[in-house]
Amino acid sequence: MSDGAAARRWGKCGHSCSRESIMVAFKGVWTQAFWKAVSAEFLATLIFVLLGVGSTINWGGSENPLPVDMVLISLCFGLSIATMVQCFGHISGGHINPAVTVAMVCTRKISIAKSVFYIIAQCLGAIIGAGILYLVTPPSVVGGLGVTTVHGNLTAGHGLLVELIITFQLVFTIFASCDSKRTDVTGSIALAIGFSVAIGHLFAINYTGASMNPARSFGPAVIMGNWANHWIYWVGPIMGAVLAGALYEYVFCPDVELKRRLKEAFSKAAQQTKGSYMEVEDNRSQVETEDLILKPGVVHVIDIDRGEEKKGKDSSGEVLSSV
C-alpha cells in the first residue's frame, strides 16, 4: 500500500473513530429525562442561591450595619440545601454544586458530557438567583450581595486551604450518606447533607464566607462585578471535593467489583512478569561467556503485555448528592 493510500485510510479511520467517540460521550444526552435533570439543577441552584445569599443581607444598611448573625446564615444555607436535595434529588441527583459534579465525574458516577451541562445549568441558576435577589432588595441595604471574600488578615493560600477543608467534609458526607452499599443509614440523607453545609458555614464564615460551592460564589460575583480572589472559590472546593470522593470511593469504601477487577489485574501482571523473568533466565543460559565479553551492550526486550485486556463493568449509576 502506498503512503498516500495509507494516509487516506488513516484519515478516514481517525475521523470515524473521533465521531464515534463523541457519540458515545454524548449518549443519553438528547433524552427527556436528561433535560429534566439539567432543568432541575438549574432551578435548585437558583432557589438555593436566592434563599441562602438572601440571609446574608445586612438590613441595617452601610451606615448602621447589624452584627453578622452566623447562626442565621448557617441554618439558612443548610436548611435550603437540605430542602433542595429532598425536592430534586430523585430527578437529577441533587448536585447543586459544580464541585460535587466534578467529584462525581472523577469517581465515574456520571459522564463528562452530562457534567458539562450540569455545571452550566448550575452557574446560570446561580446568576439568575442572585439577580432576582438584587432586584427585590432595596439599594440602601444590598451591600455586597453576599459576595464571598477572604478575610483581610488571611492570605489567598489560607483561604484556599479553608475552602478545601470545608468542601472535603461536605463531599465526604455526601458520598458516605448516599453509599448504596451501606445498610446502616436510616436517617434523612438530605438532612445530613444540610447539617454538613451548616457546620461548614459556622466554621468558615469569618475566614472565607464559607462558599463550598463555586456556583454560590459565581452568581453574586457576576451581578456585582466583584472578582477579588474569585479563583479560590473554584480551585479550593473542586480540590476538596475530588479528594473526598476519591478517598471514599477508592480507599475507605471501594466497590467490591472494582476491588475484584484490580486484584485480577495485579495477579495477571504478576504472572506475566514472572513468566518474563523465566524466559530471560532460559535465554541467559544459552549465551556464551565470550558473547558477554564481546557484546556488553546487547539488551533483550521481552514483551510482557500480551495478555488480553478484560473490560470491566461501567459503574455509571447516579448518586444522590448535593451542594
From Swiss-Prot:
Tissue: Detected in brain cortex, especially around cortical blood vessels, and subjacent to pia, with lower levels in parenchymal membranes. Detected in ependymal and astroglial cells in brain. Detected in supporting Hensen's cells, inner sulcus cells and Claudius cells in the inner ear. Detected in skeletal muscle. Detected in gastric parietal cells. Detected in principal cells in collecting ducts in kidney medulla (at protein level). Detected in brain, heart and skeletal muscle.
Primary localisation category: membrane
Keyword Transmembrane (UniProt): yes
Residues in compartment: Extracellular: 58-69, 137-155, 206-208, 223-231
One GO cellular component, as annotated: cell-cell junction
Transmembrane segments: 37-57, 70-89, 116-136, 156-176, 185-205, 232-252
Residue ranges of the motif NPA 1: 97-99
Annotated domain remarks: Aquaporins contain two tandem repeats each containing three membrane-spanning domains and a pore-forming loop with the signature motif Asn-Pro-Ala (NPA).
Function recorded in the entry: Forms a water-specific channel. Plays an important role in brain water homeostasis and in glymphatic solute transport. Required for a normal rate of water exchange across the blood brain interface. Required for normal levels of cerebrospinal fluid influx into the brain cortex and parenchyma along paravascular spaces that surround penetrating arteries, and for normal drainage of interstitial fluid along paravenous drainage pathways. Thereby, it is required for normal clearance of solutes from the brain interstitial fluid, including soluble beta-amyloid peptides derived from APP.
This protein's name: Aquaporin-4
Gene that produces this protein: Aqp4
